[in-house]
Every structure is written in C-alpha cells, then in structure tokens.
C-alpha cells in the first residue's frame, strides 16, 4: 500500500499550505514513500477523499480540508492527527507502516 497525501495546490489559505508542506517535508526527510494527490486538479480524487473519510472524522460543517492522509484505502487522519503522532514519535503506526529499525552507529 502507498501512503497518499491529499493536498490542494491552489489553496488561498497560508495555514493549509504550511500544513501540507510540513507533512510532505516530513515524509521526504524520513524517506517514506508517498503519493501527493492534488484535489484541485481532479474532481474524482476530491470526491474519493470526501467519501472515504469516516463520518466521525468529518467537520460538523463544510468539507474536510487538506491535508488528509491515507494508506491505500485506509484513512490515517488529518494534519492535527499527523502532528500529534509526530510529537509522540508514532508516525509509522499512524501511517500503518512497520517501524524502521533504529540505526546502529559503529564504534
């Protein structure tokens, strides 16, 4: 399965852009394979994202905002959930990935 990050390249909100960049940079820095899906360029992808976010995770009003993170068809969470997992050092679990073994430094 591939981690997919749903983003909006044409967002006018600086906060959304920063959150999207934070997720993408973290995944790149940790060499986690992922696909960036731009929902502003594909109505089909936008509808898929909306449909596959569990009802209890959707906002009371309006549509969920990017970034939204999936592993295959499994919903991982939004930016706030990602940030919490980053702070608690549980990103691999959050993404549904096996943790990488800690690197061992040679003496």
Curated annotation (Swiss-Prot):
GO molecular-function annotation terms?
A: SH3 domain binding
Q: Which gene encodes it?
A: Sh3bgrl2
Its GO CC terms?
nuclear membrane; nucleoplasm
What organism is listed for this UniProt entry? Mus musculus (Mouse)
Q: Which UniProt keywords apply?
A: Nucleus, SH3-binding
What's the name of the protein?
A: SH3 domain-binding glutamic acid-rich-like protein 2
- The answer to whether keyword Nucleus applies is yes
Where it sits in the cell: the answer is: Nucleus
Q: Does the keyword Ribosomal protein apply?
A: no
**Ranges in a coiled coil:** none
Q: Which PANTHER family match?
A: SH3 DOMAIN-BINDING GLUTAMIC ACID-RICH-LIKE PROTEIN, SH3 DOMAIN-BINDING GLUTAMIC ACID-RICH-LIKE PROTEIN 2
Q: Where is this motif: SH3-binding?
A: 61-67
Source domain of life is Eukaryota
A family per Pfam: SH3BGR
Family (UniProt): Belongs to the SH3BGR family.
